[in-house]
Amino acid sequence: EKSEEGVVISNFVGYMFDKACEFEVKKIYFIGELGKFVKVAGGIFHTHSRVSDAKMEILAANALLVGEKLENVYKILESNTTEEASGYIEKKEVFNLLAEKAKQKCEEHCRKNGWNLEVETLILSAEKEVIGHSKHFFDNF
């Protein structure tokens, strides 16, 4: 039976994916803002800033991977928020790269715990506009 339920997960990404697997969820459409996705793309599953914070480093590394200008990478590293940092990004494909990495990290997290869960990801700007998504996010819409 197909269900289309939405759940707010706060900072406990790993815990919520574990619970989804326990309830035998087959597919999750993971939607959220850039700051959370940057951390998950880096393999961080408890995203509260008191526990973990490497957003700018992860964002800068991925910006380099897509060929972002070095001067912009330095500005990203000096930014206070991912919203500010995103203003320095010219190579917008970095957002799709982050979405794809977050998808892979979530699926790997579940596989390590013995579950097979399909995840698709969508990244929103602070203004709630779509800025990135995994390759197959829109396939079933």
Question: Where are the model-predicted features located?
Answer:
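A structural signal for small-residue-enriched, beta-sheet-centric alpha/beta enzyme cores
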Residues: E1-N96, L122-L124
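Extended hydrophobic packing segments that form well-structured cores
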Residues: A99-F141
